[in-house]
Amino acid sequence: MGPGPRLLLPLVLCVGLGALVFSSGAEGFRKRGPSVTAKVFFDVRIGDKDVGRIVIGLFGKVVPKTVENFVALATGEKGYGYKGSKFHRVIKDFMIQGGDITTGDGTGGVSIYGETFPDENFKLKHYGIGWVSMANAGPDTNGSQFFITLTKPTWLDGKHVVFGKVIDGMTVVHSIELQATDGHDRPLTNCSIINSGKIDVKTPFVVEIADW
């Protein structure tokens, strides 16, 4: 992978009819949105303080290959993964970025398919705060780096593959967001993933999206 940090490049969305998922709410309303098929967790430490767990729901029916990569890196089943890595880039009111499991500074990363793998699709958008998307260095350069949104960055739609949503632990995400950074958006205090893994989902459930 070439030198220099991976930059979040600007992202258009194509939502196929096959991606639509419906479920009945408690009051008989129909929820619309992608279905969570698996979950992963990150236990986070800032400096020497354990600050809690981030749980991310993953949309395996929409982007199965991207989800498979993320889950395998969370479990470490290939012998490498997110455990011990850090959030290396933090921009308040925009996003936090992590997943550089090779160099730790935003210039590296690797997927379970090889150094990089192609963009799977752009069926999901960056709908608001807490959505999880692949960081890249341009088209078809997905590896292990990812980011969690802290706004609704619609300009990233069509450029970065969205594959998950934080369903628990946004207080932890915001704790990372509030860390002081240097001139390169690197946190001055290490924000580390001290443990990670998979949480099985016995019954898939819908993350509701108003404009789905």
UniProtKB/Swiss-Prot annotation:
One GO cellular component term noted in the UniProt record for this chain: cytoplasm
A Pfam family that the UniProt record links to this protein: Pro_isomerase
Regulation of its function: Inhibited by cyclosporin A (CsA).
Locations listed in the record: Cytoplasm
Record-linked PROSITE patterns: CSA_PPIASE_1 (PS00170), CSA_PPIASE_2 (PS50072)
Domain PPIase cyclophilin-type: 41-198
One term of GO molecular function: peptidyl-prolyl cis-trans isomerase activity
One of the GO biological process terms: protein folding
Catalytic activity as recorded in UniProt: [protein]-peptidylproline (omega=180) = [protein]-peptidylproline (omega=0)
Entry keyword set: Cytoplasm, Isomerase, Rotamase
UniProt tissue specificity: Expressed in kidney, skeletal muscle, pancreas, heart, lung, liver and to a lower extent in brain.
InterPro entries: Cyclophilin-like_dom_sf, Cyclophilin-type_PPIase_CS, Cyclophilin-type_PPIase_dom
EC number: 5.2.1.8
Predominant cellular place of this UniProt entry's protein: cytoplasm
Similarity comment text for this entry: Belongs to the cyclophilin-type PPIase family.
Functional summary from the UniProt entry: PPIase that catalyzes the cis-trans isomerization of proline imidic peptide bonds in oligopeptides and may therefore assist protein folding.
Protein name: Peptidyl-prolyl cis-trans isomerase C
Native organism: Homo sapiens
GN (gene name): PPIC
